[in-house]
Amino acid sequence: MNKIITMSLAAMLATLSISAQEKTYFVSPDGNDGSDGLSVESAWKTIHKVNTVVFQPGDKILFESGAVFKGQLKPLGSGSEGKPITISSFGGEKRPVIDFGEAEGAGILLENISYWEVKGMEITSKAPFKIGVGRQGISVTASGADHNLKHFVIKDNYIHDIWGQMGGRGENVGYYSSAILVRILRNRESFRDPSYKPSTINEVRIEGNKIERVDKCGIVCWGARDNVVVRKNYMDNIGGDGIFVNGPYRGLIEYNVIRRSCMRAGAPDLPGDDGWWPHVAACWIQDTEETIMQFNEVYDTGRNIYNGDGFAYDFDFNCKRCIAQYNYSKENNGFLLLMYNIFENVARYNISENDKTHLVQMQGSLKDDNNILYNNVFYVDHGLLDLDFFRGNEKETAKDINDLGAHFHNNIFYATGQGQFRTAYSTGETWKREFDDTLRPDLPSGSMFMSNCYFGPWKSGIPDDPKALVADPKFIAPGTGGDGLCSLAGYRLRPDSPCIGAGTYIPDNGRRDFFGQPVTDGKTDIGAFEYLGSIPESDPEKEAALDKAAREASSVAWARWSFPKVVATNGPSRFTIRLREPITDDIKGQISWTNPDNGKTYKLDISKLKDRRTIAIPVNANVSVPDGTKVKVSLTNGSFSEEFEIPVKEVELRNRWQ
């Protein structure tokens, strides 16, 4: 019995000891840095004092409500799982203010530390722009090698009047000058060091923050990989990008409101060196897989002369299987940008009202990239709005119009008043872009457009759509969108709409429309609204079969995309095919190459190349491979097959392999 009591007492004392380590520190203008900071009466006075303490898991650092604290907060120490270190306020509802004045860098810098949460703070600089100086409100930074940072919550903060350099080169300018910045910093030399261990950042939540009057960006999350969420943030008057997220796997960007972004980037008189990045957008992603942008609102982007962007949304380089859905775009300089080298991205059930200039700009391959826009609504009542197939800056090297674009299904294009649409191919720089709306690709009918509704004028005619519905879709009240997703009920269909049941079924469609109505199997409606009562009962077996077929076709398309467009050489003994992604286990087939010297064909079995990114193909001795030689690739997953050729440039290939 005594033993049990002794053990219980020991456990209790251990618990009390652990709890005692979790301290709450107070900071007040009336405090004293010589105090212990552990009560309001013994509060610290300055940020400088806070920066000298190494904090422990579960600690809290509370600044006095409504008070102003000068300087840059750079705390030390890390929290732990379930015990983050928190920066917040005490003593009232007003936010404490961190004012870091003319200093370069961040108002709050969390560098090479983990498990931190910043809540309910106000961060500002108010200092005027200074050439070469970049600034951030809150920065999470992994600098140097082999730091594995984790768990950052930046929530309910007000960040404003932070003026950094819009471009240039340096650790704090350009994209690194923003209200909230999450980044991994490494120097150029590290990319040439094979022993270098890159740092990582995971578990980032940026939520409920208000951001106003900032240059360059609102929120930048660059390099964080897993569990990245950017949600319910509001921003207005941003010089460059609103939200830019680079690098996550299955990230989530939702319920954000972005007003007047892209306001100063690309201005011809903007001071700075030649390292500007003038092309900016409101909400965009890059180098990311299966990331979702949804329920966001973007209004009134700017577009200065050297900014070729100004889009509300953007799938940028190396976006793979990402989705933009249930978003709203109003009076922006473009709805969506599709860069090249992006694959199987989806834009669905979005509404664009009175966007300007380029509605959608496409820079990638129609066949290889396989991006799709379906069940969106595009409304315009003034100005010319382009589906812009951008072929490049120079006419001499312009992209082939037969391999440029995206797939458009079940969309409504609605032009009224002084508005009209145009399909055009463009070349040239932003400030002197040339459009040709007479070009038409030589593609089978329906290769790009299928089952869309067209109402109102199209300069040079509507696209080639074998199932085009040229009719009034009969919206309830088109053009009446205001502020908020709830203002868009006017884009619901009337019961007599010809769009009801006229669409093409799309598998894996998210199972809901813009307004939350279920989207099931059967005759899908055209547009962002699925009219209840127009669809027969769902057939689960048929729907599952359609989804399975789509996934199977997708795996072959994905394998094809993994192959490059040109075969490179690799020394004297072989040439190589460098894959973008490893080939998955379900893909079978072969790679073959015919020696132009002796006509002999060499073959490699795909099954021997699993989990390999580089395929080395041996060649005959002293062979000159003429321009136009092809490497043939055949792929199958048992249900779907693909055959294609990859050209080899003119190179000298020498070895002894026969």
Q: What name fits each language-model region?
A:
Residues P466-L532, D547:
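C-terminal accessory segments
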